[in-house]
Swiss-Prot record:
Record SUPFAM superfamilies: DHS-like NAD/FAD-binding domain
Organism: Bacillus cereus (strain ZK / E33L)
Locations listed in the record: Cytoplasm
Any one GO MF annotation of this record: zinc ion binding
Name by which UniProt lists this protein: NAD-dependent protein deacetylase
NCBIfam families per the UniProt record, alphabetical: PRK00481.1-1, PRK00481.1-4
Length: 245
């Protein structure tokens, strides 16, 4: 009964909120079939992955970098992944006129494909790359079609738009600015282990005074920073909210 009441309370909070911010992690995409790269059996379990995905490796060996980049993220098959119920739910909130911004740690671009327009890609995106000289952008299909993608104008090897090891987070300040404006922070599908993003719930709860909601299958160790905790898959959480209408 308490569980049902929590769903109803969160539904009403979202209904009344002026500004909603959503932080998403791997759990938002695993329901689309995308592997959790940071899981025990994920791609990041390979000790060499951090080197292959580093800024230094790209600078030293850009051709080899692209070979490993494509293998690690399996970009040749990436078109098969589609937005799931969680992605659509967030897009629907926006369509209803809600001021909602998504801060995502995911690099798959599925929030945008699912219809969300206000997305801050904290770790960049697999969907695009750009020329390091003239800044011309190229899409995923171009990367798939070229073994080592080069700029058609400059012939420079493209720079991926994923944030690499050794890079700063270019969108970090924009994300924090949004946190300080928000009424509600929903954290979905992340273990909150990677800094500086792991500090976002504490900022929202302790400094901003926002209502905070956690949706994650596993406990994070940060439950004290949340007003509501749902130990569910995101699809289950969305279904629980929908059934309260």
């Amino acid at each position: 009964m308490i569980f049902v009441q929590q769903f109803e309370e969160v539904r009403l909070i979202l209904e009344k909120a002026k500004k909603i911010t959503v932080l998403t992690g791997a759990g938002a995409s695993t329901e689309s079939g995308i592997p959790d790269f940071r899981s025990a059996n994920g791609l990041y379990a390979d000790a060499n992955v951090e080197m292959y995905l580093s800024r230094g490796y790209y600078n030293r060996s850009p051709k080899e970098f692209w070979k490993h980049y494509k293998e690690i993220f399996q970009i040749n098959t990436f078109h098969q992944y589609k937005p799931n119920r969680g992605h659509r739910f967030l897009a629907e909130l926006e369509e209803q006129g809600k001021d909602i911004t998504i801060l995502t740690q995911n690099i798959d671009g599925l929030h945008q494909v699912g219809g969300s327009k206000h997305v801050i890609d904290l770790h960049g995106t697999l969907q695009t790359a750009h020329c390091p000289k003239c800044k011309t952008g190229y899409d995923l299909q171009y990367m798939i079609d070229h073994e080592v993608p080069r700029c058609q104008k400059c012939n420079f090897i493209l720079n991926p738009d994923v944030v690499l090891y050794g890079d700063t987070l270019p969108q970090y300040q924009n994300a924090v600015k949004r946190l300080y404006e928000t009424d509600v922070l929903i954290v979905m599908g992340t273990s909150l282990k990677v800094q500086p993003v792991a500090s976002f719930p504490e900022i929202a709860k302790r400094e901003v005074g926002a209502t905070t909601v956690l949706v994650n299958e596993e406990l994070t160790g940060q439950e004290y920073n949340f007003d509501y905790v749902f130990q569910n898959k995101i699809g289950e959480f969305v279904e629980g909210l929908s059934s309260r209408k």
